Amino acid sequence: MRRGAPQDQELVGPGAPGRGSRGSPPSSGPVVPVLVFPPDLVFRADQRSGPRQLLTLYNPTGTALRFRVLCTAPAKYTVFDAEGYVKPQSCIDIVIRHVAPVPSHYDVQDRFRIELSEEGTEGRVVGRKDITSVLRAPAYPLELQGHSEPTPNPGPPVWTGLTPARHLQENAPQQLATSSFLLFLLAGVISVAFLLLPLQDELGSQLPQVLHVSLGQKLVAAYVLGLLTMVLLRT
């Protein structure tokens, strides 16, 4: 066998019906383009959920097509839905899992073949496409996985910039509390002043008419004063 020639392929996945053949060229007639994504499969041995890839198969025609997935190394892979049907103008996702992620299989290229045929048990093959598959080694050696990388010695700490920063952080809540207290105190003084002012219809007051307030304003001032009292009591 010449180098690079495809080997006999088998269906992979649950319920595979046995060995397939290399297959003769498609019969005369329209040839359907086999549209798959991604065009190549790259598995990573350090994937948490296990080396797996999602292969999407598209059917651009107006009729349903039967598909099947073959592989040159069926013992290394599990294909969910290795054969079935693709609806017209639709697509289907095929999950392919590498079940033998051992070092001897790193960087070894395998080959998958996607065959499309007409609907029916004796449907003729109308399209096929070969895609390569490769298993990549982990990004880090296995003995280093699960261990944190050693951190370099940070050296002596720099105290020059730390002291002012800590001082500002400690003083910030105190400044905020002081400003809030002054704001509450000012609002309380204004509310008390509104309560002491005479009503608009009150007679005999020596204050000018502009300083007379309405009953509604006094009620609002009393409400605000009550809220401030509750806040101060809780703090």
Swiss-Prot record:
UniProt key word Nucleotide-binding: no
Tissues where the protein occurs: Detected in heart, kidney, liver, spleen and brain.
Spans annotated as Disordered: 1-31
SUPFAM superfamilies: PapD-like
Stretches that traverse the bilayer: 179-199, 213-233
Keywords for this protein: Membrane, Transmembrane, Transmembrane helix
Bilayer disposition of the protein: Multi-pass membrane protein
Protein location: Membrane
GO cellular component terms, A-Z: membrane
Skewed-composition ranges (Low complexity): 22-31
Record's keyword annotation contains ATP-binding: no
Domain named MSP: residues: 33-145
Residue stretches in coiled coil: none
GO biological process entries: heart development
Source species, domain of life: Eukaryota
Pfam families: Motile_Sperm
Disease affiliated with this protein: Defects in Mospd3 are a cause of defects of the right heart ventricle and of high mortality in newborns.
Name of the protein: Motile sperm domain-containing protein 3
Organism: Mus musculus
Gene: Mospd3
